[in-house]
Design a protein with these regions (language model features):
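Conserved catalytic core of sirtuin-type NAD+-dependent deacylases
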Residues: 1-140
Length: 140
């Protein structure tokens, strides 16, 4: 049975993906030689680092996680098409880029959040990626 036949016969597909999906959109992954930092990224993006070194956290966030010009690629659109056909029930992603939603997928579980939805722990307001990108130091 071919992959296409498996998809056609399936009724409850769930896609679980990560950085490999968005690299074709120009977004580097975390762990490859061309990626954005491996263990360093995991340290900087931890809650402890955020609490104790907030300004450095946001500098890293702005430089390494925001890709305002990135657009969905063929994989993102193919998954959205499968959802519209009723084949794909959900996308579960480790990516934070929001490209699955931009491509038209509606049932998306973003395990590590989405850079387009930022929540201020002090005032409770929500901010888009543009707000963080346009700020210096810690967004206020």
């Amino acid at each position: 049975m071919t992959f296409e036949e498996m998809i056609e016969r399936s009724e409850h597909i769930v896609f679980f993906g990560g950085a490999g999906v968005s690299t074709a959109s120009g977004i580097p992954d975390f762990r490859s030689a061309e990626g954005i930092g491996g263990e360093r990224a995991e340290e900087v993006l931890s809650h402890d680092f955020f609490v104790n070194r907030t300004e450095e956290f946001f500098d890293f966030y702005r430089k390494n996680l925001l890709f305002p010009d990135a657009v969905p690629n063929a994989a993102h659109y193919a998954l959205a098409k499968l959802e519209k056909r009723g084949k794909l029930k959900a996308v579960i992603t480790q990516n934070v880029d929001g490209l699955h939603r931009k491509a038209g997928s509606n049932v998306v579980y973003e395990l590590h959040g989405n850079v387009n939805y930022n929540y201020c722990m002090n005032c409770g307001k929500r901010h888009g990626a543009e707000y963080v990108a346009g700020s210096n130091g810690v967004p206020r």
